[in-house]
């Protein structure tokens, strides 16, 4: 733990050395600046701005509701040891790293950012299906593969949507667009993590009380309900992103 803290401190110091220098022409207090309300109104009236934020929020919730549930699911439903459940975090992070590498290569070749994000959603849907099926099959390996694929899909979606936001508003609205992206992503993630835990506890209580029938009187029922909701959210996000995809010959939404 101490080694990780030292490495984190060192990386932050290195990052500070490469920060962009302040530009006096842009930070001059005499420079005319629109109010936040005016700037926000200009942004939100852009074509597809609301759709972009809705797709981001729904997709983020779809990937994040499981955030606090994967490890207890592995232990309670599949009987994994502490070391095995801890390994899930590494597998999830490994999927994210692979996603960053793949995204860098594809976007560097001019791939559409929304298509990249959509690919991440499709991978996420398959990943949650694998996690769900690992319970009745009692297949820890399938569960671990699903966890890694969740990381991969989440990484592709997050980077794809972030890059789309950077391109969306053009140079004049880049800062506001990224701020909106961050606010929606953080709010959706917070709501998703709370909702995931609450829904799991609620459905598990119903299952234990026999309200869902004998077939669902299992510890997996609460987790499964959350994973099915996540799949539904990802499908809705995918549908919302359809009209954001660039058509052949288009440079960008506002390019």
Kindly give the residue locations of the regions a language model identified.
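A membrane-interface helix-boundary motif in multi-pass transporters
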Residues: 1-6, 201-232
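C-terminal membrane-cytosol helix-exit motif in multi-pass small-molecule transporters
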Residues: 6-25, 238-245
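Juxtamembrane intracellular "pre-TM" segments in multi-pass secondary transporters
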Residues: 20-53, 255
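Loop-to-transmembrane helix entry/capping segments in MFS-fold secondary transporters
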Residues: 82-83, 169-184
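Helix-to-loop junctions at the C-terminal end of transmembrane segments
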Residues: 98-115
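Intracellular juxtamembrane helix-capping segments at the cytosolic ends
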Residues: 156-170
């Amino acid at each position: 733990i101490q080694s990780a803290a030292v490495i984190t401190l060192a990386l932050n110091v290195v990052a500070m050395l490469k920060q962009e220098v302040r530009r006096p022409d842009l930070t001059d207090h005499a420079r005319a600046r629109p109010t936040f309300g005016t700037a926000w109104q200009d942004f939100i009236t852009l074509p597809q701005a609301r759709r972009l934020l809705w797709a981001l929020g729904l997709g983020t919730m779809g990937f994040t509701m499981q955030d606090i549930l994967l490890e207890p699911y592995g232990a309670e439903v599949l009987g994994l040891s502490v070391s095995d459940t801890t390994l899930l975090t590494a597998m999830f992070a490994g999927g994210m790293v692979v996603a960053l590498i793949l995204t860098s290569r594809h976007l560097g070749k001019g791939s559409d950012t929304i298509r990249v994000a959509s690919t991440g959603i499709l991978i996420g849907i398959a990943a949650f299906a694998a996690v769900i099926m690992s319970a009745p099959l009692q297949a820890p390996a399938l569960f671990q593969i699903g966890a890694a694929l969740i990381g991969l899909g989440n990484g592709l979606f997050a980077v794809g949507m972030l890059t789309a936001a950077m391109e969306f508003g053009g140079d004049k609205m880049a800062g506001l667009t990224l701020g909106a992206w961050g606010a929606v992503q953080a709010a959706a993630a917070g709501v998703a993590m709370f909702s995931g835990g609450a829904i799991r506890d609620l459905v598990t209580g119903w299952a234990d009380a026999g309200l869902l029938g004998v077939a669902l009187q299992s510890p997996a029922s609460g987790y499964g309900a959350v994973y099915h909701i996540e799949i539904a959210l990802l499908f809705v996000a995918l549908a919302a992103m359809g009209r954001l995809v660039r058509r052949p010959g288009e440079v960008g939404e506002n390019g």
